[in-house]
Swiss-Prot record:
Keywords attached to this entry: DNA damage, DNA repair, DNA synthesis, DNA-binding, Magnesium, Metal-binding, Nucleotidyltransferase, Nucleus, Transferase
Spans annotated as Disordered: 206-236, 282-342, 1035-1096, 1119-1147
Annotated Basic and acidic residues bias: 1119-1129
Principal subcellular localization: nucleus
The keyword DNA-binding belongs to this UniProt entry's keyword annotation: yes
Residues binding dCTP, per UniProt: 357, 423-427, 510-516, 522, 570
Composition-biased stretches (Low complexity): 321-342
Species of the source: Homo sapiens
Domain free text: The C-terminal domain is necessary for protein interactions.
Protein's recorded name: DNA repair protein REV1
E.C. no: 2.7.7.-
Residue ranges, annotated region (Interaction with target DNA): 352-362, 653-656, 709-717
Length: 1251
């Protein structure tokens, strides 16, 4: 159709022209807006924005939809389409330079203007909230506001400091009566007088539960109108959430600025050293210079009086070093004395951790878990608490008052699962003021405060630069570039604008509910909190009291039951099903009794939530807080869960919340409309299933009383400043000693060591915004796997220094150091008999076969990315061990040992060769062991020719076998080798040495499977004795002659491995598998579906059957892709004189090119698909052997460079396995994919993209 004809007809459509259509559309939208506004108004409306018409450009927070609702409620207009004549204000948070030029002269305002106008109850001036000024021609200044004049009375972000100085009494009164929170927008540091810093810090730390480093966000106050206020820890009831919802969006935008608060609580001491008094004096002097009346503005800080500091009476120190701290130095020093400022100090680490809140919490959790475990082990079945409950039962009333105040008749107790979640209210605060009645009911915070909340701005520090960096990082979802410092730093700004102090970044560990109602949150910086609430009372840490109360809490719970899961020092999960059945009490009665006893014992309040599972119990606790209880009954679950935000679900963080929001999902009710298939498509099979179940209140997680320790670590990223390499080295050794102490305390040893270093990012300020903090950093990590697990500080320290030297860092830029130890094993076990991962005895599974579910219990917990080693084995007469740089991890697709007789017990053979044995007690320097038959079968001349270390191991194994033979007669040898082989460790070389032969002098050398002569390392060959060199040359000549006269016998090679003397037996415990060029296997092991087809397939010819041991070893170790295409050299078999081997004789001249990769004989893709579909759909629990065959097939495809078919096979398996109702199939697919990706990474340096 021609365009002209279309236009001609369009002109007759009733709209005349395109402009007419748009005008009609805009008019319709305006009418719709007015009609919606009339319905939205419900008594909370106003006319604040009368005459204001906004247009939202781009992403804002609150969102455009939220702003539209706000304009409806408060008399404004919302334009979907921008009109230069009608739109009065453009709302935006970020605009490109071209758009700024296009909108030059228009009012482009940040959304905080709307939010704060509503909070103020009147229309504020838009000037402090302009996104850019008319003088700005580029976007570099978008983050700043124009400087407000000191006489400007508007309560915008530029003059909060002036309000605090001139109208403190008015503000405090207003905060107490209206719960109003003054939240700043972004502002320039180039402001007058004391305004310098308030605009920066008032936005920070408004996110619930975040521990940050003083980085604000311009939209920190804009989540006020999203209809829900998630509390900082889910502790507030609905009626308690009366504070404007300033913080929900800030919780998404506020950056997790510092890992130091996550790893160790630096703010517990602020690491104030000998300069502490100088800093406080400087703060006092600068405050007095800038505002002589400031001391009168803050009622908590009189300078010369007998005052209450932290609620206790203290005489203010007279003299120049006295401070106005809300926490006296003398009082604080008792709880947290000063910590050395230099990491080179010998007491730095111990003092640091002794004052770290999070370190104490972590240690307490471990101690409480062990406490519960000890109670369970020593339990005699007597619970004093239950006896009290039984007595209470006899006199209890038939009615009970619920937490809502309703009277309800007690129902007969049910015996269904019932979980109770106990959580102390404002734990640190409650403990801190339990003996301080004068502080109860007042806003209180636990922190290591800094006086009035201000500290000097150190030269070189640039908080705005750090803030901008983290803002970009959060918004972009990745690390941002460092902004140009020239745009942020003004060398004269500090002196010209009076910016010589900043707000304190001492973190608030916990705050009371009275403080939370005023906008203060856990994790907020103390300086910011003091601006929100000048009457905020600070309480110092008291770790001894916290531990005492935590112990009392758990002892109280243990008096009722030992089925307790220690969540934290102030939180526990209890399975009360048995208690209710025994005492005949209702959940509400039991919860009330527990709460009352906890309060009597600790003088602290606890909230209790009860549900049928852990998820519901936790959600019920949110509703119960503070100091309440709530029983979420099964019949109420559906209605209750629908109204819960998805952010309340476990595992839903900022990233997942954003993704769910993009799908239009905010509540669990919205999430219930999503099918599991769609959720799994969007979030993956496991996460999708989790969301599908959690949003319906389904949770099958048990109350776990014991938890396996996976790692031990020690990190410090506060106060790290080095000037010399030797200082860093000494610190690493000291930290290694700390690791040793922790390993010894947990009774574990570790094998995998990781060194983590935080290095100042290029371009970042040398002086950080937080005193002693790490600032903007890059994280660098190195990992090494030791031969044996250790807890020795010297070994750990040596490994750390080696890795540290490879990093080649600028010492002065180091900001954090951490050591992690993984692959833990118990200390009380012999390392040689305890592998680095759990072992599963084959006897645990019938007939030597078991499901992959059992295997994953072993393999899933620990993955090993081994230190790079390359090993060439030297055994008998021509294999020599030479170490290189790659450790081998083997995947055993089939048994490595094959009985000679078909009558041999298959189950026994499989059970002994499934790679899941406990390792032998002797290990070589490369974590390899040599297995030998009984001493009578050894050839002493061969033994003497072995390297000393290898010979020593063989002798030790013989000694062990002789010791065992006295108590247990060995089974009849097969192939000249004992079938009762000792258990194997990872990467075991099985050396089967035949009996000495009296005839055929060349038989000994011919029995060793030689590599192709081209594969022999000339240096290794030259190092051999001359006599041995001659024998090898003769063996190669003989093999060449035999190869010329022999014929191919494919059937024999298919059923029997060509090298019965040397097998690589791999432990299946290694999850990461290396690529195998040649693999020896047994088709007679287990008659699984894939193996059945394998046996009946004429194409069944194992590639490993015709490869030499050297080829086999290289295929496992080198991972260098397929070798040259010339046929592999065949093994020269002369076994007639070897007892037990005559039945295995075959004289192939040489192997032809290996057949195409096949899966149980299926080569074509359609045949493979059919076989896979039959396998997955007919079996509910896949066998280990089947999975390993699939892994081998995939690795063969990689060797053949047939990646296209590999991609199709992997994706087809994924579809089939994810459709299976058995979750074990998903685990099986993950196992297969992990191994394939490892081989791909090693071969091609990349992985397969599986969507």
């Amino acid at each position: 159709m021609r365009r002209g004809g279309w236009r001609k007809r369009a002109e007759n459509d009733g709209w005349e022209t395109w402009g007419g259509y748009m005008a009609a559309k805009v008019q319709k939208l305006e009418e719709q807006f007015r009609s919606d506004a009339a319905m939205q108004k419900d008594g909370t409306s106003s006319t604040i924005f009368s005459g204001v018409a906004i247009y939202v450009n781009g992403y804002t927070d609150p969102s455009a939809e939220e702003l539209r609702k706000l304009m409806m409620l408060h008399g404004g207009q919302y334009h979907v389409y921008y009109s230069r004549s009608k739109t009065t204000h453009i709302i935006a948070t970020n605009l490109p330079n071209a758009k700024i030029k296009e909108l030059k002269g228009e009012k482009v305002i940040r959304p905080e203007w709307i939010v704060e106008s509503i909070k103020a109850g009147r229309l504020l001036s838009y000037i402090p909230y302009q996104l850019y000024t008319k003088q700005s021609s580029v976007q570099k200044g978008l983050s700043f506001n124009p400087v407000c004049r000191p006489e400007d009375p508007l309560p915008g972000p530029s003059n909060i400091a002036k309000q605090l100085n001139n109208r403190v009494n008015h503000i405090v009164k207003k905060i107490e009566t209206e719960n109003e929170v003054k939240v700043n927008g972004m502002n320039s540091w180039n402001e007058e007088d004391e305004n310098n810093d308030f605009s920066f810090v008032d936005l920070e730390q408004t996110s619930p539960g975040r521990k940050q480093n003083g980085i604000p966000h311009p939209r920190g106050s804009t989540a006020i109108f999203n209809g829900h206020t998630p509390s900082s820890n889910g502790a507030l009831k609905t009626q308690d959430c009366l504070v404007p919802m300033v913080n929900s969006v800030a919780s998404r935008l506020s950056p997790a600025f510092s890992q130091e608060e996550d790893k160790a609580e630096k703010s517990s001491t602020d690491f104030r050293d000998c300069t502490l008094q100088q800093l406080q004096q400087s703060t006092r002097n600068t405050d007095a210079l800038r505002n002589p009346h400031r001391t009168n503005s803050f009622s908590l800080s009189p300078l010369h009086s007998n005052t209450k500091i932290n609620g206790a009476h203290h005489s203010t120190v007279q003299g120049p070093s006295s401070t106005k701290s809300t926490s006296s130095v003398s009082t604080f020093s008792k709880a947290a004395p000063s910590v050395p400022s230099k990491p080179s100090d010998c007491n730095f680490i111990s003092n640091f951790y002794s004052h770290s809140r999070l370190h104490h919490i972590s240690m307490w959790k471990c101690e409480l878990t062990e406490f519960v475990n000890t109670l369970q082990r020593q339990s005699n079945g007597i619970f004093p608490g239950r006896e009290k409950l039984k007595k209470m039962k006899t006199g209890r009333s038939a009615l009970v008052v619920t937490d809502t105040g309703d009277m309800s008749v007690l129902n007969s107790p049910r015996h269904q699962s019932c979980i109770m979640h106990v959580d102390m209210d404002c734990f640190f605060v409650s403990v801190g003021i339990r003996n301080r009645p004068d502080l109860k009911g007042k806003p209180v915070a636990v922190t290591s405060n800094r006086g009035t909340g201000r500290a000097p701005l150190r030269p070189g520090a640039n908080p705005q630069l750090e803030w901008q960096y983290y803002q970009n990082k959060i918004l972009k979802g990745k690390a941002a570039d460092i902004p140009d410092s020239s745009l942020w730093e003004n060398p004269d700004s500090a002196q010209a604008n009076g910016i010589d102090s900043v707000l304190s970044r001492a973190e608030i560990a916990s705050c009371s509910y009275e403080a939370r109602q005023l906008g203060i949150k856990n994790g907020m910086f103390f300086g910011h909190a003091k601006q929100l609430c000048p009457n905020l009372q600070a309480v110092p840490y008291d770790f001894h009291a916290y531990k005492e109360v935590a112990q009392t809490l758990y002892e109280t719970l243990a008096s009722y039951t030992h089925n307790i899961e220690a969540v934290s020092c102030d939180e526990a999960l209890v399975d009360i099903t048995e208690i209710l059945a025994e005492t005949k009490l209702t959940p509400d009665e039991f919860a009330n009794a527990v709460r009352m006893e906890i309060k009597d014992q600790t003088k602290c309040a606890a909230s209790v939530g009860i549900g049928s599972n852990i998820l519901l119990a936790r959600m019920a606790t949110r509703k119960a807080k503070p100091d309440g209880q709530y029983h979420l009954k099964p019949e109420e679950v559906d209605d209750f869960i629908r109204g819960q935000l998805v952010t309340n679900l476990p595992g839903v963080g900022h990233s997942m919340e954003s993704k769910l929001a993009s799908l239009g999902i905010k509540t669990c009710g919205d999430l219930q409309y999503m099918t599991m298939a769609k959720l799994q498509k969007e979030f993956g099979p496991k996460t999708g299933q989790m969301l599908y179940r959690f949003c319906r209140g389904l949770d099958d997680r048990p109350v776990r009383t014991e938890k396996e320790r996976k790692s031990v670590s020690a990190e410090i990223n506060y106060g790290i400043r080095f000037t010399q390499p030797k200082e860093a080295e000494a610190f690493l050794l000291s930290l290694s000693e700390e690791i040793q102490r922790r390993l010894e305390a947990t009774g574990m040893k570790g094998k995998r060591l990781t060194l983590k270093i935080m290095v100042r990012k290029p371009g970042a300020p040398v002086e950080t915004a937080k005193f002693g903090g790490h600032g903007i950093c890059d994280n660098i990590a190195r990992t090494v796997t030791l031969d044996q697990a250790t807890d020795n500080a010297k070994i750990i320290g040596k490994a750390m220094l080696n890795m540290f030297h490879t990093m080649k860092l600028n010492i002065s830029d180091m900001r954090g150091v951490g050591i992690h130890v993984n692959q833990l094993v118990p200390t009380n076990l012999n390392p040689s008999t305890c592998p680095s991962r759990p072992s599963v005895q084959s006897s645990h599974f019938p007939s030597g076969s078991y499901s992959v579910r059992d295997v994953f219990q072993v393999q899933k917990a620990k993955k090993s990315t081994e230190e790079e080693h390359k090993e060439v084995f030297r055994a008998a007469v021509d294999l020599e061990i030479s170490s290189a740089s790659r450790t081998c991890t083997f995947l055993p697709p089939f048994p490595a040992h094959l009985p000679t007789s078909p009558d041999t017990n298959k189950a026994e053979s499989s059970g002994k060769w499934n790679g899941l044995h406990t390792p032998v007690s002797v290990q070589s320097r490369l974590n390899l062991s040599i297995e030998v038959p009984s001493p009578s079968q050894l050839d002493q001349s061969v033994l003497e020719a072995l390297p000393p270390d290898l010979r020593e191991q063989v002798e030790q194994v013989c000694a062990v076998q002789q010791a065992e033979s006295h108590g247990d007669k060995k089974k009849e040898p097969v192939n000249g080798c004992n079938t009762g082989i000792l258990p194997q460790p990872v990467g075991t070389v099985l050396l089967q040495i035949p009996e000495p032969q009296e005839s055929n002098s060349d038989a000994g050398i011919n029995l060793i499977a030689l590599p192709a002569f081209s594969q022999v390392d000339p240096e290794v060959f030259a190092a051999l004795p001359a006599e041995l060199q001659r024998e090898l040359k003769a063996a190669y000549d003989q093999r060449q002659r035999q190869g010329e006269n022999s014929t191919h016998q494919q059937s024999a090679s298919a059923s029997v491995p060509k090298n019965p003397l040397l097998h690589l037996k791999a432990a299946v415990k290694e999850k990461k598998r290396n690529k195998k060029k040649k693999t020896i296997g047994s088709p007679k092991r287990i008659q699984s579906p894939l193996n059945n087809k394998l046996l009946n397939s004429p194409a069944k010819t194992l590639p490993g059957a015709c490869g030499s041991p050297q080829k086999l070893i290289d295929g496992f170790l080198k991972h260098e892709g397929p070798p040259a295409e010339k046929p592999l050299e065949e093994l020269s078999a002369s076994t007639s004189g070897v007892p037990g081997l005559s039945s295995l004789q075959s004289d192939p001249a040489g192997c032809v090119r290996p057949p195409a990769p096949n899966l149980a004989g299926a080569v074509e893709f359609n045949d493979v698909k059919t076989l896979l579909r039959e396998w997955i759909t007919t079996i509910s629990d896949p066998m280990e052997e089947d999975i390993l065959q699939v892994v081998k097939y995939c690795t063969d495809l990689i060797e053949e460079k047939d990646l296209e078919k590999l991609d199709l096979v992997i994706k087809y398996m994924k579809r089939l396995m994810q459709q299976s109702v058995e979750s074990v199939w998903n685990m099986a697919f993950d196992f297969i994919l992990d191994n394939v990706q490892v081989v791909l990474q090693q071969t091609y340096g990349s992985t397969l993209k599986v969507t």
